[in-house]
């Protein structure tokens, strides 16, 4: 069984037992969270698509870790004007272990 969930403005296809990295969630490591924004639920033979959400469907997950992605480097330059600007950014993430999908 799998589900398509929405969290942090992005959509993820998840199944029980998987680990996924999502945008940072305000939860402690080891805490169990419930994601109720389920867009679709499938089990191979059939697919249940919500409009926009599947009513009564939830995904239970445990917070495994918090961290930062690799640095993205931004470089701006204007030719012939001796203007150069360098900037870096590291996006924070939360790693989740999917426990169960209830549809």
UniProtKB/Swiss-Prot annotation:
Keyword line: Ribonucleoprotein, Ribosomal protein, RNA-binding, rRNA-binding
One GO MF term: rRNA binding
Pfam families: Ribosomal_L21p
Family membership noted in the UniProt record: Belongs to the bacterial ribosomal protein bL21 family.
GO biological process assignments: translation
InterPro entries named in the record: bL21-like, bL21-like_sf, Ribosomal_bL21, Ribosomal_bL21_CS
Classification lineage: Bacteria, Pseudomonadati, Pseudomonadota, Betaproteobacteria, Burkholderiales
Gene Ontology CC entries for this record: cytoplasm; ribonucleoprotein complex; ribosome
Function in brief: This protein binds to 23S rRNA in the presence of protein L20.
Organism: Acidovorax ebreus (strain TPSY)
Quaternary state and interactors: Part of the 50S ribosomal subunit. Contacts protein L20.
Protein's name according to its UniProt entry: Large ribosomal subunit protein bL21
Ribosomal protein keyword on record: yes
């Amino acid at each position: 069984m799998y589900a398509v969930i929405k969290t942090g403005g992005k959509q993820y296809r998840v199944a029980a037992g998987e680990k996924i990295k999502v945008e940072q969630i305000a939860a402690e490591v080891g805490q169990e969270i419930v994601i109720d924004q389920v867009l679709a639920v499938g089990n191979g033979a059939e697919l249940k698509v919500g409009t926009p959400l599947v009513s009564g469907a939830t995904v239970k997950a445990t917070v495994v870790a918090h961290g930062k992605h690799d640095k993205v480097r931004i470089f701006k330059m204007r030719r012939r004007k001796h203007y150069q600007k360098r900037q870096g950014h590291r996006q924070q993430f939360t790693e989740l272990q999917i426990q169960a999908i209830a549809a």
